[in-house]
C-alpha cells in the first residue's frame, strides 16, 4: 500500500512539473503588472511526437482554477494564433517600438483561460523535428493535428484542465478548422475505446468564418452591390445578362469565377465574370485603396512608426498612403508620446486627434503586424517563451502568416455542411454554437455566413427564433443583431446556434469592437445551459474596466505613451 501511494504521489508531482515547466517567468518589455499567469510550450501533434505544435495560454483574470478554457485558432490558412493574442483578443499589445507590451483592457481572458494553438505545423513557432521547412498542409491533416495537439494538451502539457469546461473559438479559415475539430472531438467523446480526455465540451464559436466558399462569393456580390461598389447600369446589366431575371439573392454568381487554389477567386474572363470582378475583389494586392478586412477603416500613414518590415507572410492586410519625412515623423511621434498626464491633454485636445488612420487606437491595426514580428523574433522573447534551440537551428523566423503554407495548402472541403450535420446528429449532451460576424468584412462576409447557417438549421430541423438587437452594456448602444436556431437531436441533446453580427466591426472583431466582443464571448461561455443567451447582459462582464498598475520604468516617455494609450482605449465605445 505504501509503495502504491508513493508511486501515485510521484506521478502527481511529475505531472504538475510537466505543466508548470511552460510557465513564462518574465515576459520581456511588459509595462503593466499582470494579475494572471501565462504559459508557453509545445504539445505533440502526432503520435510519434515529431510534429511540435506551439501553444500559449493566458490564464483568467478572475478565477483561473475554475473558469472555463477557451481554445483559439487564427485562420489563413497559415496564420499564427499569436497574431490573435498580440493583435486582437489577448492581454498584450505590442508598442510600435517592437520591444514593449501595453495592456489590452478588453482581453478575452477576463473570465476565461485562453489557449492559443499555432496550427498547422509550420505556422509560427510550430515545427517538424525531422523535416526543416515543412510547410505542407491540408484540411484533413490540420484537423488531425489539432485533435492530437488538444489531446496532448489535456493529457500532458496542462492536465489540470482535463475536467474543465471548454470551448473552441477562432476566426476566418478557422471556419473550416473548428467544425472539423468539433466533429472529431464529438466522435472521440462518444468512443469508449479511445475516448477524448475531456468530455466537458460545451460549444464552439466561429468569427467571420470561411465556411462555404460559393456562398461567400455569392453573398459578397450582393453585399458589394448594395455598398456602392457598382453603378446602377452595371448592376442592371448583371441582373439582365447573368442572373437573367432569376432571384439574385439565391443566384450562383460563383459559376463566373475561377481559382488556382480554391481559396482566392477572380472573375473567369467571361462577360459576366468581368462584370462581377469589381464586386468580388478583396484588394488582395493592396492597390485598390480599401481594407478588405474592414471596408470602412483606413491606414492613412503607417510610416511614422519606426517598425521593421514584416518578417513575411500575409497577403496585403493594410494599405497606407505615401510616407512622410523624418522631420514629420519625429514631430508626430512627439505629439503621440509627450502627453505627460491629463493636464496637457486638457490644454490641447488637438493632440488626441489621430492622423494616422480613422480609428481611435493610434492606428494600431496599421502597424501591429510589423511590431509583433519584431517582438516575437527577438532572442530574449523567444527564450522567455521557451522556444527550443531545435526550432532556431532550422533557421526559422516567426511570421504572422506564413505564405509558404498558404501557397501550398490544399483546401479539400469547400463547404462545412457535412461537419455541422455530423456534429448535430452525434451529440449526446447539450451544445451551443456562436457564429459571429463583423458586418463590414469583405473577406468572410456576414451575409454568406448567415445563409450558410440557415441551410444548416434547415437540414437539421432547427427552429428559428426572432432576429433581435443586442447592446453594449457600457452605454446601451446598439452592438449588432442576434438570431437563435435551436432544437433537439435524436439523442435528446439540445443544440443552439446563435447567429450574431457585431456592428461596425470587420474581420478582426476583437480588435475592431473590443468592448462588445469580450461582452459577447463572456456571455457565450458563461450562460446557463438551455437558455436563450442574453448578449446584452452585464452578469458575466463588467464594462467598467480597471487597469493594472504599471511596472517601474526608467523611461518617462514610454510610461507617458503607455498612459495615453490607456486613456484612448478606455474611451472606446465601439
From Swiss-Prot:
Any Pfam family the entry gives: Peptidase_S10
GO terms for MF? serine-type carboxypeptidase activity
EC id: 3.4.16.-
Q: Where is the active site?
A: 172, 441, 507
By its UniProt entry, which SUPFAM superfamilies does this protein fall under? alpha/beta-Hydrolases
Asked if Transferase is a keyword of the record, the answer is: no
For this UniProt record, give its keywords in alphabetical order, as a comma-separated list: Carboxypeptidase, Glycoprotein, Hydrolase, Protease, Signal
Q: Would you kindly state one Gene Ontology biological process term found in this protein's UniProt entry?
A: proteolysis
- Stretches of the chain forming a coiled coil according to its record: none
Q: Which residues are glycosylated?
A: 48, 163, 241, 408, 414, 426, 534
Any one of the GO CC terms: membrane raft
State if Hydrolase is listed as a keyword.
Answer: yes
The residue range of the signal peptide is 1-19
Entry's family note: Belongs to the peptidase S10 family.
Protein name as annotated: Serine carboxypeptidase ctsa-3.1
Amino acid at each position: 500500500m505504501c509503495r502504491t501511494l508513493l508511486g501515485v504521489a510521484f506521478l502527481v508531482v511529475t505531472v504538475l512539473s510537466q505543466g508548470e515547466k511552460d510557465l513564462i517567468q518574465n515576459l520581456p518589455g511588459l509595462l503593466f503588472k499582470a494579475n494572471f499567469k501565462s504559459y508557453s510550450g509545445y504539445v505533440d501533434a502526432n503520435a510519434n511526437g515529431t510534429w511540435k505544435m506551439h501553444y500559449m495560454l493566458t490564464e483568467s483574470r478572475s478565477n483561473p482554477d475554475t473558469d472555463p478554457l477557451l481554445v483559439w485558432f487564427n485562420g489563413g490558412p497559415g496564420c499564427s494564433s499569436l497574431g490573435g493574442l498580440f493583435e486582437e483578443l489577448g492581454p498584450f499589445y505590442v508598442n510600435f517600438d517592437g520591444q514593449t507590451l501595453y495592456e489590452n483592457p478588453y482581453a478575452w481572458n477576463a473570465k476565461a483561460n485562453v489557449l492559443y494553438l499555432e496550427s498547422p505545423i509550420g505556422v509560427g513557432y510550430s515545427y517538424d523535428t525531422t523535416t526543416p521547412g515543412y510547410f505542407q498542409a491540408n484540411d484533413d491533416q490540420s484537423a488531425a493535428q489539432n485533435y492530437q495537439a488538444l489531446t496532448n494538451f489535456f493529457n500532458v502539457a496542462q492536465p489540470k484542465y482535463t475536467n474543465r469546461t471548454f470551448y473552441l473559438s477562432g476566426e476566418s479559415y478557422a471556419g473550416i478548422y473548428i467544425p472539423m475539430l468539433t466533429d472529431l472531438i464529438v466522435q472521440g467523446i462518444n468512443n469508449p475505446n479511445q475516448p477524448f480526455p475531456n468530455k466537458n465540451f460545451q460549444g464552439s464559436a466561429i468569427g467571420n468564418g470561411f465556411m462555404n466558399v460559393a456562398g461567400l462569393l455569392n453573398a459578397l456580390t450582393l453585399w458589394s452591390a448594395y455598398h456602392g461598389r457598382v453603378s446602377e447600369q452595371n448592376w442592371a446589366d448583371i441582373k439582365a445578362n447573368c442572373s437573367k431575371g432569376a432571384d439574385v439573392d439565391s443566384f450562383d454568381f460563383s459559376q463566373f469565377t475561377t481559382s488556382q487554389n480554391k481559396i482566392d477567386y477572380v472573375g473567369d474572363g467571361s462577360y459576366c465574370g468581368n462584370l462581377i470582378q469589381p464586386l468580388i475583389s478583396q484588394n488582395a494586392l493592396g492597390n485598390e485603396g480599401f481594407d478588405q478586412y474592414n471596408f470602412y477603416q483606413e491606414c492613412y500613414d503607417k510610416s511614422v512608426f519606426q517598425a521593421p518590415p514584416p518578417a513575411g507572410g500575409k497577403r496585403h492586410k493594410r494599405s497606407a498612403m505615401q510616407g512622410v519625412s523624418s522631420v514629420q515623423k519625429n514631430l508626430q511621434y512627439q505629439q503621440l508620446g509627450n502627453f505627460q498626464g491629463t493636464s496637457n491633454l486638457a490644454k490641447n485636445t488637438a493632440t488626441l486627434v489621430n492622423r494616422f488612420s480613422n480609428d481611435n487606437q493610434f492606428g494600431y491595426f496599421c502597424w501591429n503586424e510589423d511590431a509583433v514580428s519584431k517582438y516575437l523574433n527577438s532572442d530574449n522573447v523567444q527564450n522567455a517563451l521557451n522556444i527550443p534551440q531545435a526550432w532556431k537551428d532550422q533557421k526559422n523566423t516567426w511570421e504572422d502568416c506564413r505564405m509558404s503554407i498558404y501557397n501550398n495548402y490544399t483546401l479539400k472541403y469547400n463547404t462545412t455542411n457535412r461537419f455541422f450535420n455530423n456534429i448535430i446528429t452525434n451529440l449526446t449532451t447539450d451544445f451551443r454554437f456562436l457564429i459571429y460576424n463583423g458586418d463590414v468584412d469583405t473577406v468572410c462576409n456576414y451575409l454568406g455566413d448567415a445563409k450558410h447557417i440557415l441551410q444548416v438549421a434547415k437540414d437539421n430541423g432547427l427552429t428559428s427564433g426572432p432576429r433581435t438587437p443586442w447592446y453594449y452594456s457600457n452605454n446601451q448602444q446598439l452592438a449588432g443583431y442576434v438570431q437563435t436556431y435551436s432544437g433537439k437531436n435524436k439523442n435528446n441533446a439540445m443544440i443552439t446556434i446563435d447567429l450574431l453580427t457585431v456592428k461596425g466591426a470587420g474581420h478582426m472583431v476583437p480588435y475592431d469592437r473590443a468592448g462588445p466582443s469580450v461582452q459577447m464571448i463572456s456571455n457565450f461561455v458563461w450562460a446557463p445551459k438551455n437558455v436563450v443567451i442574453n448578449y446584452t447582459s452585464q452578469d458575466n462582464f463588467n464594462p467598467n474596466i480597471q487597469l493594472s498598475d504599471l511596472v517601474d520604468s526608467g523611461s518617462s516617455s514610454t510610461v507617458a505613451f503607455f498612459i495615453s494609450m490607456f486613456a484612448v482605449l478606455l474611451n472606446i465605445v465601439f
